Each structure stands twice: as structure tokens, then as C-alpha cells.
């Protein structure tokens, strides 16, 4: 996977340490964690990254043991930090300056609501319509939490000088996220010292529907929606142009950076199978 790209993302990177197995025909309650040799697997990923000059990002969201993050940090694997989840102890959004450097930061992902969808509670409405809430009272609690989080986000933008008090008051009363606030959110996150920032087109275009809704199969059109603009139309789209200029000022390309020389050597595909075989 590293052969022709500059970066790879390891989904559920905790699987390098353990994976929850459920035997066929059994329930999740009957499953168990199967553990792997974390240091040995990281010791395979790291040299391959150097050899192919490919950055590695580990998707370390959810319940992740500290030892996994420590091992990945020692190997130079970037953490995966999302604005929605990065909070202070009291629930406020973590300021950009407090984000870690060895990480990729983003507002959201394909498995979470888009910025516009999060703002209007589109994800909560959808989960309610598909009966995905195990407890009916959970919807009410999450609606209350979401209302508080919208205010927390606006106040975070105001503290960074990206919105003034009048703009905060106006945005707080709007059901639909305006383009000015969308740009402010991305510029706020761009101030983080994190090495990489990722931007979703769905967030820039303020689309309410997320690409994938976990917990569904044929109940929801996962991975089947197209963006409303062609690449040519996107190039002249005002919101995208303004955001690109703003991000370019905050996170400019490194001066003097030269194109990476990709690895030209032929790498045999079964190498790692041999390395992990006890008789090798």
C-alpha cells in the first residue's frame, strides 16, 4: 500500500495490539480480545515507511490503551485527532495551541456527521428515523448536548478572534451553518501545531449528509452519494477559493521543499510473510 503514495492511514490502528473476535454463530458477549505483538508489528511498519518515504497515520479514535499511542509515537506514526472529540476537561473545545504536533487534525471523518450535519443535528435525526438509538431518552440528551456544543464552538472561535460577538450571536440563532462560520472553523483548526491537517469537501461545501453511517447496511446509501460540484466547478467556487487562500497563509508549503524521490527498487510482495515465519 505504501508503494505509490505519500501517506497511508491505518484504520483502527489498535488492531496492531488487539482485536475483538466473535466466533461464528456467537454473540458479542461471547467474544474476546485476541492480542498481538505490538512492538513487532510496529517494527515492520516503521522501516517500510522510511524505505518508501511514506507517512503513516494511525486512526487511534475510541478506546485506545496508552501503550498503543506511546508505541506509535516512538515510531513516528501520526495520531488522528478530530475537532469534535478534542475537548478540555469541562467540555470546551481544545484550543488549537493545545493540540499535539505529531498528529493529523481534521474537523470530522466519513463515519461522523459533516460540520453542517453536526450543526443542524442531521445525524441525530437520521439515527432516530432508523431506530438506531437503543434508549429513546438518549436522543433527548444528545440534542441538549449538541445545542451546548454549538455555543461552545462559537465561543472558541470568538476567543481566537475569528468571529466577533455580533457574528457569534447571529450564527447561534441560525439553523443552517453559514459560509463565514465554516471558514472560521477550518482556520481555527489550521492554527494547531499538528503536522498535517485534512479537509473534507463535504465540510467546505456545507453538505449535511455524511459518507457513511456506522451501524447500517442497506438502510442508508453509504458511499453512494456524489458531490454536487464537478472538479471544474469546485475550482471556481467562492467558499473553496477563500478557504484555500486562508489555509495557505496559515499552513504554507515548506520553503525549498523538493519533490520526494519515490522508491524505484522492486520489492517482493511475500517479504513480510517470510519475516513473520518462525523458520525464516
Task: List where the protein language model places each region.
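Catalytic cores of glycan-processing enzymes that make or break glycosidic bonds
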Residues: 1-270, 278-280
Amino acid at each position: 500500500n505504501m508503494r505509490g503514495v505519500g501517506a497511508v492511514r491505518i484504520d483502527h490502528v489498535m488492531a496492531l495490539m488487539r482485536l475483538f473476535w466473535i466466533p461464528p454463530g456467537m454473540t458479542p458477549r461471547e467474544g474476546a480480545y485476541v492480542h498481538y505483538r505490538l512492538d513487532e508489528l510496529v517494527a515492520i511498519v516503521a522501516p517500510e515507511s522510511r524505505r518508501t518515504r511514506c507517512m503513516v497515520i494511525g486512526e487511534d479514535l475510541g478506546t485506545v490503551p496508552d501503550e498503543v499511542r506511546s508505541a506509535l509515537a516512538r515510531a513516528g506514526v501520526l495520531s488522528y485527532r478530530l475537532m469534535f472529540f478534542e475537548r478540555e476537561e469541562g467540555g470546551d473545545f481544545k484550543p488549537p495551541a493545545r493540540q499535539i504536533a505529531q498528529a493529523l487534525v481534521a474537523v470530522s471523518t466519513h463515519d461522523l456527521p459533516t460540520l453542517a450535519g453536526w450543526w443542524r443535528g442531521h445525524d441525530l435525526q437520521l439515527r432516530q428515523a432508523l431506530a438506531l438509538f437503543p434508549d429513546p431518552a438518549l436522543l433527548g440528551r444528545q440534542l441538549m448536548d449538541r445545542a451546548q456544543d454549538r455555543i461552545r464552538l462559537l465561543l472558541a472561535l470568538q476567543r481566537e478572534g475569528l468571529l466577533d460577538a455580533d457574528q457569534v450571536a447571529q450564527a447561534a440563532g441560525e439553523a443552517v451553518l453559514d459560509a463565514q462560520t465554516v471558514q472560521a472553523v477550518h482556520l481555527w483548526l489550521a492554527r494547531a501545531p499538528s503536522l498535517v491537517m485534512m479537509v473534507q469537501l463535504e465540510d467546505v461545501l456545507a453538505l449535511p449528509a455524511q459518507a457513511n453511517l456506522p451501524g447500517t447496511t442497506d438502510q442508508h446509501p453509504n458511499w453512494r452519494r456524489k458531490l454536487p460540484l464537478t472538479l471544474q466547478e469546485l475550482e471556481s467556487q467562492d467558499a473553496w477559493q477563500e478557504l484555500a487562500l486562508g489555509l495557505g497563509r496559515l499552513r504554507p508549503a515548506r520553503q525549498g521543499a523538493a519533490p520526494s524521490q519515490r522508491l524505484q527498487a522492486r520489492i517482493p510482495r511475500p517479504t513480510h510473510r517470510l519475516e513473520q515465519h518462525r523458520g525464516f
